[in-house]
Amino acid sequence: MARKLSNTVSDLYAGMRLDSYLFEAGLYPTRSKAVKQIEAGKVFLNGKEPAKKDIVNEGDLIIYEELVEETHVYLEPEDIPLEVYYEDGDLLVINKQPGLICHPSPGHPGGTLSNALIHHYGRENLAHIQGDDRPGIVHRLDGDTSGLMLCAKNDEVGYILQDEIRRRNVDRKYLCLVHGNIASDTGLIDAPIFRSDKNRTRMQVSDKPQARSSVTTFNVLERFESGLKDNGFTLVECKLYSGRTHQIRVHMEYINHWVVGDQTYSNPGKSSNLGLCRQFLHSYFIEFQHPCINDTLSFMAPLPDDLIQAISQLADRRIGLTERGHEVLAAYQENCGITEERESFALV
C-alpha cells in the first residue's frame, strides 16, 4: 500500500502550477505521472482535491501518495561525524557543520546529513515525513550555514515539530557578521520575498502579488571600525518571524549590509570577506517545547573555528558592545566555559 507523505512548498517554487511543482520538486518522476496522481485523487493541496493547473504558494501543505515502484529512494549510510547536543527516543538536536547539505538533491546525491543520520541511527529509527530521501529532516539550514537543527526519530514527533516551526513556536536565533556599521541598535525588516526573475536559485525582495510576507528582526551586538579595504563590520543577532529561503541573507542585502563571505548575495565592491569562503551565518540558539515531555529545552552553539578566525581579525578595530551585546556575550562565555571575562566577540 502506498504511503502518504507530506511536503511544504518553499518560496523557491511559489507561483508554479501544481503539476509542474510535483515534478520540479522531485515528488514524482515525471510531470505526466504527477497529472495522473492528481486526477486519481491521490494529491491534496491544503486539505482539498486540487486541479493540475492550481497555483502553489509558499507554505502550502501537500499530501501525496508515494509511487513506491518508481520513487523509492535508497540512501547509502555514510560515516559522517555528527555533533549531537541532545538526544532521546524521539528527537535530536545537532550542531550542523558548514558545508553539510541537509538532504540529497540533483547536484548532491550523497554526503548529506540524511546519509549521516541513517548511518548513526538506522533508517527505521528516523522520521520519514518528507520522504525516504530525507530521513530525520524536519527543517533545513543552507549548506554553508552552520548551527543548531532539530531532527526527528519518528513521524509523530516529526509532524509536531514541523507544525511548531510553521507556527513560529520554535525560537531560533542566528549570529551574523555584515559589512558596514548599522546605525540603529535594533531593527525590523518587513519586506516580502520572492524568487529572482533572472536566477531561480536566488531570492529577492519583491513587490509582486505572489511575494510572501517576510519579517526579520535584529539586534546589533558589536561594531568594528572601517579599514583600508572596507567600511567596517557589524555583528548582529537575527531572529526570523517567517521562514523564507535565504531570508536573513536577502534582507541584509536589502538594507545594504551584505553578509560577510556570502557568495550569492554580495556587493562586488565589498572586497574584504576576512578570508571566508562561506557566509558568516550561524544558528547559535534554539528553544522549543519538547512534544512528549512538555519541557522547554534551549541550547546554544559556539561559533565554529572558521568564523572565530574571521572575526578575531577585527580585535584591534572594535568600537564596543551594545547592551544586548553584553547580554549575549555573557551567556555565550558561560555556555562555552570561558571563565575569564572577554570584552569582545573578537576575543573569544
Question: Where is each model-derived feature located?
Answer:
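RNA pseudouridine synthases
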Residues: 1-348
